[in-house]
Amino acid sequence: MFAFGAVPAIVLLVGMLFLPESPRWLLSQSLVKRARAILERIRNKENVDKELEVINKTLKQKAGGWGELLEPWIRPALIVGIGLAFIQQATGINTVIYYAPTIFEFAGFESAKVSILATAGVGIVNVLMTIVAIWLLDRLGRRPLLFTGLIGMIVSLTVLGFAFRVPSLSGSLKWITVAGLACYIASFAISLGPIFWLIIAEIYPLRIRGRAMSIATVANWTFNMIVALTFLTMADKLGRSSAFWLYALVAIAGLVFSYFYVPETKGRTLEEIEESLRSGKCFKKV
């Protein structure tokens, strides 16, 4: 059974063999021709010379220290990274994944086998909708998908809360729970799931990207630990419906935060995003 976990790792390994080198890394190694060839594959050939020039200029800058993360012009990007990390975890996604069999038992699935099968179904929805998100990200943009997914999560979590609260729904609770969790997972998979990791790879200047991304990643797993450790206690003390409603409130706050602070990075180069940060433009319009 545990050997099945090696299958996605092998698929990832094989897929990585076909990934091209980063043009920035190639230029840092003075491999200009290879960098140009890769840029010509993914960009308009007419703009390649200009982009090579901009990348070369960026590479000449020295790596930034930890103190630079506190500079006013970088602070908005740091807030976005930590904010999205909090929203991704505090809307309860890993709680649902970790405790899905328990949640289905709460809903009335008495057989452990059926609960596990329902959990597997939720996982399949997650994989399929993540593939859909990959296809849509560069077509619709990050912000529209983020808003759509958060709205879907809010609705799903609210419905789940009512399903556990209203006695007259007890007979239908099983299937409302399955449908609600499937919609919740699907909404997450097209929005917060991939977009958090994509955004933190795009919004930070090259000099401090490693440090800034490490902070966002540590924040993400810290919030994950806190939420996972508190779910069962919260469901016991507040009630199962209140737990889902609390996650819905976090999703509402996340929607407001995303509208005002999360930038649209579709079609923008890393250098253009950094220039917008330095110029002090409204981050929403980066």
Regions found by a protein language model. Give the residues of each.
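Short intracellular "coupling" helices and adjacent cytoplasmic loop segments at the cytosolic face
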Residues: 41-51
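Loop segments that connect adjacent transmembrane helices in multi-pass transporters
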Residues: 33, 49, 53-57
